[in-house]
Regions:
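Conserved NTP-donor binding/palm subdomain of two-metal-ion nucleotidyltransferases/polymerases, i.e.
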Residues: 1-51, 57-264
Length: 264
């Protein structure tokens, strides 16, 4: 199983290099989100269970990027207002027109403004993955976004321990490079301070992350909710998608849980 995970990572990394080469030849500079970029913070990046390739394109080059992939596509998943998922060279590539949306209008406005501030500028980071250089979001945004994505995933489908591991690993591996106050400010603007504390409970108490690596330290009153989150992860299966009952839960159930998860 481990050899298969390593092989899958190698394949995905090779396809990242190919899609970057294709886009760059057509004057598109994609920003790699989550996945293989986050994996580089693991002790062995090849041992993280990988998925698809998420690329932030933005509205300007979105249709152009989709058209480029479609010439060698073998299938396509449903397109929504945020992204298109295209099966290309045996892997799924998500081209994002919109990086993500937050439910609160004021939080979402701050989130979109932050993306507009760095997208297409030298504020982005460069990272080598298996010898090929790719573009990532600025570090503070990236750390805050890893948590944001997991919190949204939790609401919609549930999460697995991998999502908490991703956040713990990026915080710890990058501890000498990151600005914890800047990350805390972003999370506060996006309405995710409480989520950061709850994830912190799991990361510190169960994954061994030092408390000082957290952007927003949790308090005693957050521990019970952190335990509830961990229990929800165990019930949901490996990646939070194995529990079929979850899809049948009423919307009010999840909005109630979301309130518990995000209120300060």
């Amino acid at each position: 199983a481990l050899l298969q995970i390593e092989e899958n990572n190698h394949i995905l990394n090779q396809e990242i290099a190919k899609v970057y080469t294709l886009y760059r030849a057509n004057q598109i500079e994609p920003v790699l989100l989550k996945g293989q970029g986050v994996a580089q913070n693991y002790r062995n990046p090849l041992h993280r269970q990988c998925g698809d390739i998420d690329l932030y394109i933005g509205p300007k080059n979105y249709e152009k990027a989709n058209k480029l992939l479609r010439t060698e596509s073998t299938g396509e998943h449903e397109e929504n207002h945020k992204h298109t998922c295209i099966h290309w060279h045996g892997v799924d590539i998500e081209n994002h027109r919109v990086l993500s949306r937050l439910s609160s209008p004021s939080s979402d406005k701050s989130f979109q403004q932050e993306i507009a501030r760095w997208h297409g500028t030298t504020a982005c980071r460069n990272l080598e993955i298996e010898g090929y250089q790719v573009t990532l979001p600025p570090l503070s945004f990236d750390v805050a976004y890893v948590l944001t994505h997991s919190a949204l995933h939790f609401l919609n489908e549930g999460i697995g321990l991998r999502q908490v591991c991703d956040w713990a690993n990026i915080l710890h591996t990058q501890k000498d490079n990151i600005d914890l106050k800047e990350i805390a400010d972003l999370l506060q603007k996006w309405g995710l301070s409480k989520a950061a504390k709850i994830f912190g409970v799991v990361a510190v108490n169960y994954l061994g992350l030092p408390m000082e690596d957290l952007p927003i330290p949790y308090t005693q009153k957050d521990i019970e909710t952190g335990e509830w989150l961990l229990n929800d992860i165990w019930q949901g299966g490996n990646f939070g998608q194995h529990n079929q009952n979850r899809k049948q839960r009423p919307k009010g159930y999840w909005s109630g849980k979301w309130y518990t998860f995000t209120r300060a």
